[in-house]
Structures are given as structure tokens and as C-alpha cells.
Amino acid sequence: MQSSEGSPDMMDQKYNSVRLSPAASSRILYHVPCKVCRDHSSGKHYGIYACDGCAGFFKRSIRRSRQYVCKSQKQGLCVVDKTHRNQCRACRLRKCFEVGMNKDAVQHERGPRNSTLRRHMAMYKDAMMGAAEMPQIPPEILMNTAALTGFPGLPMPMPGVQRSHHHAALSAAFQPPPSAAVLDLSVPRVPHHPVHQGHHGFFSPTAAYMNALATRALPPTPPLMAAEHIKETAAEHLFKNVNWIKSVRAFTELPMPDQLLLLEESWKEFFILAMAQYLMPMNFAQLLFVYESENANREIVTIVAREVHAFQDVLNQLCHLNIDSTEYECLRAISLFRKSPPAASSTEDLANSSILTGSGSPNSSASAESRGLLESSKVAAMHNDARNALHNYISRTHPNQPLRFQTLLGVVTLMHKVSSFTIEELFFRKTIGDITIVRLISDMYSQRKI
């Protein structure tokens, strides 16, 4: 297998463009050389300026307690530079120590400092798990997302203008409302069509939260993201979704049991909508490869790989419909104020069986039916308000698409068929362990700390 150190750039066949690996990203300090091999550094690693290649080599060597032997006739005198750094591991490690790399920094490393899920998991664990090394992904997986047998390719990329609109939508959709009665949620360059609130005001997030979130807009998504970055961004969106829900005044006025129940039932749809709006396209082949390498249960791996098809189908439809930010907001409201709990998918039934989880934990949808909503009529009214807002907006902005409203509602129904178990396994299982996403976001919502 060819090392990725010598070829940071890879050609993505699907998009016919160069995809930069993490080593070729904007983190590279072209004016500061690596003290080990003199390649471009990417910042300080273990006490010195070093490139990702040497930093990764040092980390692996220390964590695995490697004892290398120099095979050269001139013991310990091998050249360690960008060209020859992989030829003698013993001399490379020796030079790492000579230039000042600190092995204690590796031993006490606590994983990515900006890990969203790890920050929130601190509520449940006194010590956070160390960041395990990402398995080396074969080039054929990186370059061809259809490499898995029978696995479909990625969704077609959005046109350039539409993609820029999607990235701009994050900040545009979260601007403070211009007035108490009208909120403009249109994307850039779309004619101004203000969305009027229903009498319940579900489009009324608090101004303080909107101002704070507007200053934390995510950077544009690259054409293809590495699996680790996808998971991190997915976690960020998961908790941003919860914060968005907390900012909806009509929702927070419901009894707390109703809020928690609706949150538990809608987190999956919110996650799918966020992934479609802000994180397309995705390399599912990378995600599955990493998941398979980390999971010894072949039965679960097989089920997750099969269920990813449904997830991708929904993302494909959402992508191809060119949904703007206002429509996304309406779809979120429709998903949030659901009149009845969605039916569990077959995979979720399996996930709740002792075969997969070792426990017979009840399905959240089943418990929803037994508990019911305390303010069911109010929730139903807000659901109707959201549907009417979407219908009225589409009538004004897409008069030549009479079926668009029903098509979008159909996608909402299709989202119900995506397995929340698969999403949890693929994006979050390694980090959250045995704790369910439902419990995690519900506890955080209740404590009002995210």
C-alpha cells in the first residue's frame, strides 16, 4: 500500500477534481519546516514544529512502544529528510527525540481538543477516551465511492451557485428576525418573500441565540470530507439542532415532557436535514470502511451497510430538489411538531433486540404511543402552521412546480424510514459508547447546557 505521505493530493474520479488530503490542507505552514524531515510543517506537535507524517509516526511509535533497529552499516547515520524519511524507522525516531519531541505529550494526550461529542460526553465520563488512530484507508476506497460491492455512488454534486447558496444559508437562516411578526428566511439572490408566522410563532428563535450562532457559522464543506471530519461536523450539527430547537419560543412553551418527547422523535429528521443542507456530498465508502475496521460484530456491520442505502436515497432526493433555506426551516418545523410518532424501521426493531444490543431496551416510538402528548392539540396546530407556511412559500416562489409541496412532504415521510440505529452506529457509536443519542441530547436539553 502506498503511503499517503508522499502523495497528499488525490484525484477524485467522481468530481473530476483534485481532493486535498489533510496533509495538503490550509493548516500547512509553508514557511516553517518540519524539524525532523524539513518538509512543510503543520504546526506544533509534541513540542516542536513538525509535519503530519512525522508527528503521526512519532505518536504510533510511542503508543505501541516500538523498538526499531537500524539496518544500515553505519548505525544511526541514515539520512532523514522528506525523500528518505520512510527508509529507516530507527533513525527517524532517533531524530524525533534529538530535535525535541516529547513522548510524555503522547502518553497524556486526550484526543482532539475540539471534539464536539467528547466535550459533551464529559457530562457522563470523568475521563474521556483517547483518540484512537484512524485506520489507513485504501486508495481505491478514497478514490471510488462505489468500491464497495453493490454500493451506489455519491449524490451528484450541486451546481456551483447552488452550493454557494447552501453554504451561505447557514448564516442567512440564523440572522435575528427583522421584526416580531416577519422573519426572512430566503437564501441569497432569491427574491424577498418573507414567511409570516402562524399564530403559534414557531419561526421565532430568540434573538440572543441567533446573534451568537451567526458568529459561529461553519466553514464551507470541501468536495469530499475525510471520515473523521465528517463525524466531527455531524456531531456539531447534532448539537446545533438541539440549540435551534431550544430557541423556538412556541416549542419551549410546551410542557417539558412534551418537549422531550418531540425532541426524541425528531432528532433523526433534524440530523438528516442538516447533513443534506450543509454537509453534501459525503463519502459513505470511507465511513463504512472506518466503521467496519472498528466493529467486530459482523452482523451489525452487515445491517448498517445495507441500511446506508436508505440514508443515501434520502440525501440524494434532498440534494436534487435544490431546497432553499426557507423550505428547510419549514421541513424542520413539520418534523418537530409531529402529530404522531413515526413507525420504527425494521433495523430499529433489530437494534432493540438482545441479538444486537444485548438488552431489550424499549423503542422510543413505542413508548411515545403509551405516554402520548399533554398538549397534543397545540402540537397539531403548530404542525398545520408549518405545513401552511411551506405551502404558501412554495406557491409564491415555485408557481410552475405544482407538485413541489407534496414532493417535499414525501421526502419527510421517506426520512422516517431511515434507521436512527444506523445513524447512531455510523457517526457516533465509537465516541458515545453504550449511551444512546436520545438519552444524550435529552439530558443536555433538560439541563439547558449545550
From Swiss-Prot:
GO terms for biological process: cell fate commitment; insect visual primordium development; inter-male aggressive behavior; mushroom body development; negative regulation of transcription by RNA polymerase II; neuroblast division; positive regulation of transcription by RNA polymerase II; regulation of cell cycle. Residues 31-108 bind DNA. GO terms for cellular component: nucleus. InterPro entries: NHR-like_dom_sf, Nucl_hrmn_rcpt_lig-bd, Nuclear_hormone_rcpt_NR2, Nuclear_hrmn_rcpt, Znf_hrmn_rcpt, Znf_NHR/GATA. The keyword rRNA-binding does not apply. A zinc finger (NR C4-type) spans 34-54, 70-96. Keywords: Activator, Developmental protein, DNA-binding, Metal-binding, Nucleus, Receptor, Repressor, Transcription, Transcription regulation, Zinc, Zinc-finger. Monomer. Belongs to the nuclear hormone receptor family. NR2 subfamily. PANTHER family: NUCLEAR HORMONE RECEPTOR (PTHR24083). Orphan receptor that binds DNA as a monomer to hormone response elements (HRE) containing an extended core motif half-site sequence 5'-AAGTCA-3' in which the 5' flanking nucleotides participate in determining receptor specificity. This receptor binds to the consensus sequence [AG][AG]AAGTCAA. Plays a key role in the establishment of non-metameric domains at the anterior and posterior poles of the embryo. It may also play a role in the nervous system. This is Protein tailless.
